[in-house]
Amino acid sequence: MDIRSAGDVKIPVIIPRVDAQTAKEVEAKLNDLVSGGNRRIVCDFSQNDYISSAGLRVFLQMLKLMQKSGGKIVLCSLKPQVKEVFDMAGFSQLFRIFDTEEEAIKEL
């Protein structure tokens, strides 16, 4: 998973599939960002085509961790099929989701 920066905002580019096989890798990299003191994170889903319930759990854990640490995590560039999964799971109510990375960065 690549991670870019825009000022003090970290932008992890979420891998194409986040499922039971890959969720731990994604979680570890996101946890590294938070434990490294990053408090503004934009998760870029432009490369992601699929997320399972295991993947959703990773992002829910990250949201809770960021809220505890006084940080913010937002999502951007979700493809329609991925957005539908977030909608069906009720996660669209929990996360701020933006069409573009630029909009997401402005929110932080």
Describe each region flagged by the PLM.
Residues 80, 102-103:
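Acidic phosphotransfer microenvironment of two-component signaling modules
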Residues 8, 46, 102:
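Conserved catalytic submotifs in the C-terminal HATPase_c
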Residues 20-94:
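Amphipathic alpha-helical interaction surfaces in cytosolic regulatory modules
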Residues 96-100:
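Short acidic-hydrophobic, aromatic-tinged amphipathic segments that line or gate anion-handling sites
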Residues 1-13:
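Short beta-strand/loop segment at the start of cytosolic alpha/beta domains
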